[in-house]
Amino acid sequence: MEPLLPTPPLLLLLLLLLSSSFVLPAPPRTPRHSDGTFTSELSRLQDSARLQRLLQGLVGKRSEEDTENIPENSVARPKPLEDQLCLLWSNTQALQDWLLPRLSLDGSLSLWLPPGPRPAVDHSEWTETTRQPR
């Protein structure tokens, strides 16, 4: 019996696969400007995160010390709850008075002008002389 030899296309494919495994590694990539930009931005963000953790730690320690030093019989302000109503807006009459539209100088409605006396002159003389006819 004769040994089976691979057919020519299979032999070529085998040689191609074997030769590609001996390829030299790619040369090192040249540094780019974007690499430096990314690195500096990353280090800036890391520094910012470190500073934020430090501040949170300091504030947390300080608040823990404050709660430890408060005597039990002292009057301490309770922490506000999320479902509490803001007392500034509990006076609905004052809120409605503030939101009512007010008349501006030319008689149109305006939310921005405060209530009070209006000037006797609607327009100055300078305004009248510089006004262009429509």
From Swiss-Prot:
Residues 1-21 form the signal peptide. Keywords: Amidation, Cleavage on pair of basic residues, Hormone, Phosphoprotein, Secreted, Signal. InterPro entries: Glucagon_GIP_secretin_VIP, Prosecretin. GO terms for biological process: adenylate cyclase-activating G protein-coupled receptor signaling pathway; brain development; dentate gyrus development; diet induced thermogenesis; embryonic digestive tract development; hippocampus development; intracellular water homeostasis; negative regulation of gastrin-induced gastric acid secretion. In the brain, expressed in the central amygdala, hippocampus, area postrema, nucleus of the tractus solitary and cerebellum. Expressed at higher level in the cerebellum. Its main location: secreted. Transmembrane segments: none annotated. It is found in: Secreted. The modification Valine amide is found at residue 59. Disulfide bonds: none annotated. Coiled coil: none annotated. One of its GO terms (cellular component) is extracellular space. Residues 22-31, 63-134 form a propeptide. PANTHER family: SECRETIN. Belongs to the glucagon family. Hormone involved in different processes, such as regulation of the pH of the duodenal content, food intake and water homeostasis. Exerts its biological effects by binding to secretin receptor (SCTR), a G-protein coupled receptor expressed in the basolateral domain of several cells. Acts as a key gastrointestinal hormone by regulating the pH of the duodenal content. This is Secretin. It comes from Rattus norvegicus (Rat).
